[in-house]
Amino acid sequence: MATITIEPATSPRWDDVQHALSGGGDGRSCQCIWPVVRNKVWQTTTLDERRDMLQAEIAAGPPPGLVAYVGDEAAGWIRVGPRTVQQRILHTRAIVAATTEPLDDDSAWAVTCFVVRREHRGQGLNGRLLASALDYARESGARLLEAYPVDTSTGSHRSNDLYHGTVSTFLAAGFELGPTLTAGRVLVTRGLAD
């Protein structure tokens, strides 16, 4: 079995980020820009513009996500960072109503996206990405990590709808269940002092 490693998404890893995002699902077309822009911007941007936005975000630093490698192949991605730079969180009514954290608190971070290439699914990469995201957030000064995963116990879901992650993955990583956001989605949190 190939070794799995997780690394920050930095400019030298740009091609790997693109490889991880392009292996099935909406990652290639989204470029993981959905969490950081409002609807009006999202609806008026092209794939090339989204790609440029992500590349600029990575170049500016700090890394907005992590890349999972299976051997030497970029196989997965997770977006993790302060909620304050993920504009969609700040303007999603269900999240704003459910969170108990101040929206302007830079120490409250969020996981908002997972992508795993089709050929690497079913190997536990989401769990590995999440564990590394916890470490990365803690090392970067975050005191709390929040997420908005899908509750797969409520029925079947298309794989493209699981980019938020699943409740079971977060619970296995020590997150606590919070309020329901919408049908099939909940808020989960984990303090990072431990």
Give short role names for the model-derived ranges.
Residues 1-39:
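Conserved N-terminal entry element of GNAT/NAT acetyltransferase domains
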Residues 17, 63-78:
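Conserved beta-hairpin
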Residues 20-23, 78-89, 135-137, 144:
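Short, solvent-exposed beta-strand-terminating loops
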Residues 30-64:
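Active-site rim helix/loop that mediates acceptor-substrate recognition in acyltransferases
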Residues 56, 60, 74-117, 121, ...:
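Conserved acyl-donor/pantetheine-binding loop and adjacent beta-alpha core of acyl/acetyltransferases
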Residues 108-111, 137-159:
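Conserved GNAT acetyl-CoA-binding A-motif
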Residues 111-116, 122-139:
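Conserved acetyl-CoA-binding loop-helix of GNAT-fold acetyltransferases
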Residues 160-194:
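C-terminal "cap" of GNAT-fold acetyltransferases
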